[in-house]
């Protein structure tokens, strides 16, 4: 109910812009490798399905992103339809990022610990979603997900939920890691 006005206004703006469907749907991986269809507001032109699938290379200034899409990404509004995934039980509010299926195998080869992300249900928000941005490397996002999993507590989830709201008001909320340190817990190294 709280986000209804934002959801409705965004859907209307996307429909009036006429750049294709309102929603972007894609298969993603979650707990135990289960697959679900994530729902997001469309931020890219719908002209070429292959280009749409290549969202990893989408960066600031990418010509595939619509003008409305730039605004939605800047303030992370494109992520709000994932609340539907949460209500369906496919995602949790807080957890590791829901990864594209084609990237799970690739990232597991590059970062073997990546497979541990599937120990928890994917989340709408989490450490990687807050500290990592659209242009943060997959390896760094995986490390942030692992830090979250290793330090999971309900109080930590609550803290991350509160921090999520602050990204809507930060200008750098989508710019990736900079020179600043991550406000992250330390990873416990086990022998």
List the predicted regions and their residue ranges:
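Short beta-strand/loop motif that positions the catalytic acidic residue
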Residues: 146
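Short, hydrophobic secondary-structure boundary micro-motifs
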Residues: 10, 24-25, 53, 94-96, ...
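Gly/Ser/Thr-rich helix-start
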Residues: 19-21, 34, 70, 90, ...
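Short, glycine-rich, amphipathic interfacial segments at transmembrane boundaries or analogous
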Residues: 24-64, 124-143
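A hydrophobic, helix-centered structural microdomain
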Residues: 1-47, 85, 154, 159-191
């Amino acid at each position: 109910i709280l986000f209804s006005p934002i959801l409705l206004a965004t859907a209307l703006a996307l429909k009036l812009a006429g750049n294709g469907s309102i929603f972007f749907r894609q298969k993603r991986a979650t707990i135990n490798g289960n697959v679900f269809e994530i729902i997001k507001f469309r931020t890219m032109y719908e002209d070429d399905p292959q280009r749409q699938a290549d969202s990893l290379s989408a960066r600031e200034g990418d010509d595939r992103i619509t003008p409305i899409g730039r605004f939605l990404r800047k303030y992370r509004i494109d992520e709000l339809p994932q609340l539907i995934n949460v209500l369906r039980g496919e995602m949790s509010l807080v957890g590791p990022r829901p990864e594209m299926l084609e990237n799970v195998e690739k990232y597991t080869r590059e970062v073997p610990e990546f497979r541990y992300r599937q120990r928890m249900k994917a989340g709408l928000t989490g450490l990687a979603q807050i500290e990592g941005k659209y242009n943060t490397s997959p390896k760094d996002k995986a490390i942030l997900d692992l830090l979250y999993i290793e330090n999971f507590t309900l109080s930590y989830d609550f803290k991350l939920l509160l921090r999520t709201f602050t990204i809507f008001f930060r200008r750098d909320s989508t710019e990736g890691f900079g020179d600043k340190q991550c406000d992250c817990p330390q990873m416990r190294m086990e022998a």
